[in-house]
């Protein structure tokens, strides 16, 4: 066993050795909790400060949750004893929690594309219960106590989602993942290449995930924009993706994740601004689509470009800008005039811009844009 799974087993042995007063078993169990706190190219903490489980699969949440739960719990037990977590491992834990894990959380909710198959479980994006991890870190890593206190305040909603959030941009070169953080919003991009696995559907969970890893994006201000939306989503229209509108969503041949087929996926960052590029290529006969896509990250805008879209699919190919909960009205440009749309389904001819929930979508070229604002229904268990 590795990573989070190993930690769960070791916790059992810690309790058992304490009850039986077996010091040798206790030391072995604690070592098994702390030993995964190293950078690796296998499952576990990656050199880019991301986290992998089930092979080369991004799992900042989900299995990332589990290893943080176990490690912070045992580290708090061992504080001040001969088993105390050493300085180097504390630094790794601190860096991952402050600069990756909690940066993917906006307000109370985590980005949907870093939790793996957990996205198909009700309520799993909400990370309020992880205040326990941050609370433990105040004692384990007192040098960053103020940061953990701010994290706790945001998670408890005693402070707004932008409270003490500072600007940052990170491209996780191991995980094929870009995260852009501003006090006003978060924006991320998840890719899949021949180096990284696509999101899994093991245990018959997350059965509609096929396009999830193909350049999907989150844009969040409060963090509630996608919370529990997934039963009513159109999974052919995952935000950021370019995909044929197939009648039935395909499934990868292996439930626990398969490597992507794109050979070009990457990004650059100076820690504040960045760019990400992706030569999307899916050779599945049901899809057989490719596109060149890129994202450029600034303070108040993200520029998303697409070119060279080719497909042999018999279905129309759509690029989805966003698919989130409807909030208030939608304001659109119609021939230079502003118009507020009623609920319904629209085909807009060459709108210059669309405004929804304080986010403006600008279309520099004259394009046909499909827009829906309506009630949708669905179920969790047919996912």
Please annotate each region the language model reported:
Residues 1-121:
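Aromatic-lined, polymer-binding surfaces characteristic
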Residues 67, 74-383:
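Extended polysaccharide-engagement surfaces of secreted carbohydrate-active enzymes
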């Amino acid at each position: 066993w590795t990573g989070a799974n190993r930690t769960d087993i070791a916790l059992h042995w810690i309790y058992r050795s304490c009850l039986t007063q077996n010091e040798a078993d206790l030391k072995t169990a604690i070592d098994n909790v702390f030993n995964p706190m190293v950078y690796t190219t296998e499952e576990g903490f990656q050199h880019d400060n991301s986290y992998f489980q089930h092979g080369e699969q991004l799992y900042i949440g989900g299995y990332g949750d589990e290893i943080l739960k176990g490690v912070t719990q045992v580290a708090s037990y061992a504080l001040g004893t001969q088993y105390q977590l050493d300085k180097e491992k504390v630094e790794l834990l601190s860096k991952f929690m402050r600069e990756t894990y909690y940066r993917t959380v906006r307000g109370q909710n985590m980005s949907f594309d870093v939790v793996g198959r957990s996205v198909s479980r009700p309520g799993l994006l909400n990370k309020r219960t992880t205040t326990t991890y941050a609370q433990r870190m105040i004692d384990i890593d007192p040098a960053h106590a103020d940061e953990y206190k701010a994290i706790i305040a945001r998670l408890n909603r005693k402070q707004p989602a932008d409270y003490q959030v500072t600007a940052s941009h990170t491209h996780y070169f191991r995980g094929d993942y870009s995260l852009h953080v501003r006090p006003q919003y978060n924006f991320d991009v998840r890719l899949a290449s021949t180096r990284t696995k696509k999101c899994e559907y093991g245990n018959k969970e997350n059965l509609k995930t096929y396009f999830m890893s193909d350049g999907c994006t989150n844009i969040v201000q409060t963090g509630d924009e996608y919370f529990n939306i997934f039963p009513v989503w159109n999974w052919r229209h995952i935000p950021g993706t370019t995909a044929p509108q197939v009648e039935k969503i395909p499934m990868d041949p292996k439930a626990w994740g398969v490597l992507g087929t794109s050979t070009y996926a990457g990004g650059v960052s100076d820690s504040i601004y960045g760019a990400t590029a992706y030569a999307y290529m899916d050779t599945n006969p049901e899809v057989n689509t490719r596109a060149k896509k890129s994202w450029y990250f600034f303070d108040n805008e993200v520029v998303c470009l697409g070119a060279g879209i080719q497909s042999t699919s018999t279905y129309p190919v759509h690029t989805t800008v966003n698919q989130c909960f409807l909030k208030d009205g939608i304001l659109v440009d119609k021939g230079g005039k502003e118009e507020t749309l009623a609920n319904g389904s629209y085909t807009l001819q060459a709108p210059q811009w669309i405004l929804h929930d304080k986010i403006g979508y600008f279309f520099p070229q004259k394009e046909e844009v499909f827009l829906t604002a309506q009630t949708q229904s669905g179920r969790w268990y047919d996912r």
